[in-house]
Each structure stands twice: as structure tokens, then as C-alpha cells.
């Protein structure tokens, strides 16, 4: 999956730039797009402020990012349905 122009910036800004390759693999495997990834990384950053990873940062990120990808897709689909009427 080619890196979306803004995606790397979001990962840099949130402090998870080193985990971008893992995030790309996860998203590609599960069929998520760049917009969903951007939304998810923002939600991961919010969660990290409240519940920062304390032991295994990579495992924490993988678990939370997968959860937030699903949440981002659901929110985007709900918004799409709402705006279509």
C-alpha cells in the first residue's frame, strides 16, 4: 500500500512514526483505506494521552489501532449514510 501523502505527517505528529510500517500492514491486510487510518491514528493518540502504553508499546499499539480502525470505519459509514439521506 503506498503511503498517503498526509498519513506520515499524522503518524509523526502523534508520536507513532516508528509504527507506520506495522499500521500499513494491518490496514492492508484488513482492507482499510488511508482516510480510515488517519481517523484511527488520531483516536489512538487520544487514547495514549489517557491510557499510555506502559509495557509493550508495539502490542498496545496493534491492539488499540485495530480497535480504532474498526471504530473509524463504523463512524465514516454512519456519516455517509446520514449525509445521503
Regions found by a protein language model. Name each.
Residues 41-85:
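Short, cationic/aromatic linear interface patches
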Residues 1-32, 84:
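Long, charged low-complexity interaction segments
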Residues 32-44:
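Short cationic/low-complexity microdomains
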Residues 7, 22-26, 37, 69-72, ...:
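Generic structural signal of hydrophobic/aromatic residues within well-ordered alpha-helices
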Residues 5, 20-21, 35-38, 55-63:
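Non-catalytic, well-ordered alpha-helical scaffold segments
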Amino acid at each position: 500500500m503506498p503511503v498517503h501523502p498526509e498519513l506520515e505527517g499524522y503518524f509523526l505528529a502523534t508520536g507513532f512514526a516508528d509504527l507506520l510500517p506495522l499500521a500499513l500492514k494491518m490496514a492492508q491486510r484488513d482492507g482499510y483505506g488511508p482516510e480510515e487510518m488517519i481517523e484511527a491514528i488520531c483516536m489512538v493518540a487520544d487514547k495514549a494521552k489517557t491510557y499510555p502504553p506502559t509495557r509493550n508499546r508495539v502490542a498496545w499499539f496493534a491492539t488499540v489501532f485495530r480497535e480504532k480502525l474498526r471504530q473509524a470505519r463504523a463512524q465514516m459509514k454512519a456519516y455517509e449514510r446520514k449525509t445521503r439521506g
